[in-house]
Amino acid sequence: MSQLLSTPLMAVNSNPRFLSSSSVLVTGGFAVKRHGFALKPTTKTVKLFSVKSRQTDYFEKQRFGDSSSSPSPAEGLPARFYVGHSIYKGKAALTVDPRAPEFVALDSGAFKLSKDGFLLLQFAPSAGVRQYDWSKKQVFSLSVTEIGTLVSLGPRESCEFFHDPFKGKSDEGKVRKVLKVEPLPDGSGHFFNLSVQNKLVNVDESIYIPITRAEFAVLISAFNFVLPYLIGWHAFANSIKPEETSRVNNASPNYGGDYEWNR
């Protein structure tokens, strides 16, 4: 039975198999640290009177989360969040989901990046008014380099990405995916057009969705923000401890001879 939903189903342990030469597929979420702020009490006593409606309570819970109903993460494990941004139009819907990079543990106890993260684009055709058939969705994975192409795209520029999931294998050429991003004729935004030709299951489909200038700006802003996380640089930055760096440098004064400015 077809899934007629306004939003896609998001599996926690998704493992899509759409590998290509220009994109890497991994799974996982992002760990988020929470920071609190302490307010210092004052010596003055001030009486405050306020009126708060039930509607305000509702929106506050929707915005910040209701701690009484939200599940708590397992003890000792960081909270994991799975997010996505969706754009709905008359004939199709587009959802963009970030996928975290992968690391491997070294014998020294450190971790090394093994696979870059990526952005998973899911296109679903319309199945009625404000309904989309996500069982017939087509997916396209954007590598970090392809993301860089998009964020540097000018208002009148276009780009095209080609993927062959079976490149280098016996079924090479039987599945072709082409994503085109081109400006709208009136300059009001861009359109995303995903064409999929799959000779293995006799599929030849094209899904088109227009993106307004404002919607495109939101996507580009999100892409710029998440890009350092997709290449794992946030993990390196979070691991830097000034006291340890100072101790290593003092113990080895000649350390850093390979740096260009020390030559």
UniProtKB/Swiss-Prot annotation:
SUPFAM superfamilies: ssDNA-binding transcriptional regulator domain (SSF54447). A motif (Nuclear localization signal) lies at residues 167-180. GO terms for cellular component: chloroplast; chloroplast nucleoid; chromosome, telomeric region; DNA repair complex; extracellular region. It is found in: Plastid, Chloroplast; Nucleus. Induction: By salicylic acid (SA) and infection by H.parasitica. The keyword Oxidoreductase does not apply. It comes from the Eukaryota. Residues 89-94 are annotated as: Required for ssDNA binding. Disruption phenotype: No visible phenotype under normal growth conditions, but mutant plants present a progressive lengthening of telomeric repeats. GO terms for molecular function: DNA binding; mRNA binding; single-stranded DNA binding; telomeric DNA binding. GO terms for biological process: defense response; DNA repair; negative regulation of telomere maintenance via telomerase; regulation of DNA-templated transcription; regulation of telomere maintenance; salicylic acid mediated signaling pathway; systemic acquired resistance. Coiled coil: none annotated. Single-stranded DNA-binding protein that functions in both chloroplasts and nucleus. In chloroplasts, maintains plastid genome stability by preventing break-induced and short homology-dependent illegitimate recombinations. In nucleus, modulates telomere length homeostasis by inhibiting the action of the telomerase at the extreme termini of chromosomes. Is recruited to a distal element upstream of the kinesin KP1 to mediate the transcriptional repression of KP1. Is required for full salicylic acid-dependent plant disease resistance responses. Can bind double-stranded DNA in vivo. Belongs to the Whirly family. Homotetramer. This is Single-stranded DNA-binding protein WHY1, chloroplastic.
